[in-house]
Amino acid sequence: MNVFWFLPTHGDGHYLGTTKGARPVTLNYLKQVAQAADDLGYYGVLIPTGRSCEDSWVIASALVPLTERLRYLVAIRPGIISPTVSARMAATLDRLSGGRLLINVVTGGDPDENRGDGSFLDHSERYEVTDEFLKIWRRVLQGEAVDFEGKHLRVQNAKALYPPIQQPYPPLYFGGSSDAAHDLAADQVDVYLTWGEPPAAVAQKLADVRERAARKGRTVKFGIRLHVIVRETSEEAWKAASTLIEHISDDTIAAAQKSFSRFDSEGQRRMAALHDGRRDNLEIAPNLWAGVGLVRGGAGTALVGNPEEVAARIKEYADLGIESFIFSGYPHLEEAYRFAELVFPLLPEPYASLAGRGITNLTGPFGEMIANDLPPQAK
């Protein structure tokens, strides 16, 4: 099991949909989140992409030298950048990070943003471009001098002279819910990602990708993207979920859902269908809450509950074949600690052992000393 955290390069705060309790995106704050995730033992962090975010490659480049073990899941955008240039960027960052780069392949689901970035392709064409892009990208990073002519992309003598540390190339992660996305995942990527739908729906998606990959003689690993709201009691967790959206007006929800409706992303459509823009009845499966998606695009569901409930839901997804869990919580600095402290002890190794760092001992007490000479009591 690999547990990731998330870098909030599009903003952070205590609530959704309001400036109340909000935090600006600064390098110092992102450094705090990244270093906390590194110190706590998270496998890596996802850096989002899009016009509402700071650039993921610049952010990763700034944070890599400030962390020791943390991996960075960074987006590439087929159709926006040359596959050869992208491959060389990946090789460089992989070398500079000591092999800590992971690649998130993003086709882009917002036609308005895509046109602003210079891409006027429709949904099916974007997947055609992504397929051609990855064929070039993968070969370049394996040391080939590539000649390629496809429907959309053409290169001659494309090459990267400096190889990545990870061989044959940094692992490719990719998410999508359409048939075209499942075909692409089965054919070219290492880890297929899904947003946090109910377990039965996730099981269907994984089975479909698994079957398509088997027909091509391949195996694909699986991951899931979820928010998390965990507290010591279930009542506290659900209260925190309610508090997170208490400042969102109905007009704001309507405006957000109208914006999402222009997307041609099947995944976004499925996320929106979980709540239909309504704030009532947001628990769509046991401990799975769709409130985040009322105003946030992309991943819109959260695991909500006490540590045992959250761990049980994680195990439920793991039993389906999920190996990588990409979590986030508001605010991201505090919640990185809270999730590690409350849930890591209930997860498989190495996370259970990482949580054991909090055991008090006389040579290195954790927690504030009592009076002037008494260590805190172990729990």
Swiss-Prot record:
Keywords: Flavoprotein, FMN, Monooxygenase, Oxidoreductase. One of its GO terms (biological process) is alkanesulfonate catabolic process. GO terms for molecular function: alkanesulfonate monooxygenase activity. CDD domains: Alkanesulfonate_monoxygenase (cd01094). The keyword Cytoplasm does not apply. Belongs to the SsuD family. This is Alkanesulfonate monooxygenase. It comes from Pseudomonas syringae pv. syringae (strain B728a). The gene is ssuD.
